[in-house]
């Protein structure tokens, strides 16, 4: 009877310790999600409103380039997800879906990384050109367009850093749910493997 009470008390103490450890991470997680929203929205706004007209070379818009369109869509999706996760963070039932939050944070970080890479490549080609395929740089003619695109990519990168940190925090929260094997269980398993009877204290 005492053994059962002791194991229950130990489990309760372990659970209380988990709550104490996780509390600061909850605050950091909320702060990162709040920061990610304006960064992603600003990236969308900066890119979606980006256009410039040149008397000689005509008009260029973000929608003319697939890498920029991809960045806009991904940032819009991650901003919406961040808002939803902030609103749901106050609900107790959300802890049941920690695995889902973990996977969504990982997916958001990956998508932001791919969108940053795609858009950064377009910006680089616009600024430097590609001599191997005889592409000239265009930022000397569309400087304002290139500048706004660069700002949008930088904001996207900042949102990416937020989600990279969120991925680590959500992973920590998920995997701390698993208790390490107790000493008594380890002794019992070892005794069974050696074929010896288990003597309980």
Swiss-Prot record:
Extract the ranges annotated as region (Disordered): 180-201
Locations of Polar residues compositional bias?
Answer: 180-194
Q: Which NCBIfam families match?
A: A_tha_TIGR01569
Q: Which residues lie on this side of the membrane: Extracellular?
A: 48-70, 120-148
What InterPro entries does this protein's entry cite? CASP/CASPL, CASP_dom
What is the recorded name of this protein? CASP-like protein 2D1
Family label: Belongs to the Casparian strip membrane proteins (CASP) family.
To which species is this protein native? Answer: Oryza sativa subsp. japonica (Rice)
Its GO CC terms?
plasma membrane
**Which residue ranges does UniProt annotate as crossing the membrane?**
27-47, 71-91, 99-119, 149-169
Location relative to the cell: Cell membrane
Q: Which UniProt keywords apply?
A: Cell membrane, Membrane, Transmembrane, Transmembrane helix
Give the record's membrane topology. Answer: Multi-pass membrane protein
- Could you give the subunit structure recorded for this chain? Homodimer and heterodimers.
Cytoplasmic topological domain residue ranges: 1-26, 92-98, 170-201
* Superkingdom of the organism of origin: Eukaryota
**Family matches, as PANTHER family:** CASP-LIKE PROTEIN 2C1-RELATED (PTHR33573:SF30), CASP-LIKE PROTEIN 4A4 (PTHR33573)
């Amino acid at each position: 009877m005492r053994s059962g009470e002791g194991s229950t008390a130990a489990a309760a103490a372990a659970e209380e310790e988990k709550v104490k450890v996780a509390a600061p991470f909850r605050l950091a997680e909320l702060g990162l999600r709040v920061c990610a929203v304006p960064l992603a929205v600003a990236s969308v706004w900066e890119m979606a409103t980006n256009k410039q007209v040149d008397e000689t070379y005509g008009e260029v818009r973000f929608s003319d380039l697939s890498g920029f369109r991809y960045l806009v869509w991904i940032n819009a999706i991650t901003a919406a997800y961040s808002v939803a996760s902030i609103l749901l963070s106050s609900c107790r039932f959300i802890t049941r879906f920690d695995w889902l939050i973990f996977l969504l944070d990982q997916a958001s970080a990956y998508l932001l990384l791919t969108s940053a890479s795609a858009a950064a490549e377009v910006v680089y080609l616009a600024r430097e050109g590609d001599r191997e395929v005889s592409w000239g740089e265009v930022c000397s003619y569309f400087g304002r367009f290139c500048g706004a695109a660069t700002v949008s990519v930088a904001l996207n990168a900042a949102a990416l850093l937020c989600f990279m940190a969120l991925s680590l925090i959500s992973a920590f929260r998920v995997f701390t749910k698993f208790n390490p094997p107790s000493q008594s269980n380890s002794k019992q398993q070892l005794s069974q493997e050696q074929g010896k009877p288990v003597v309980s204290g």
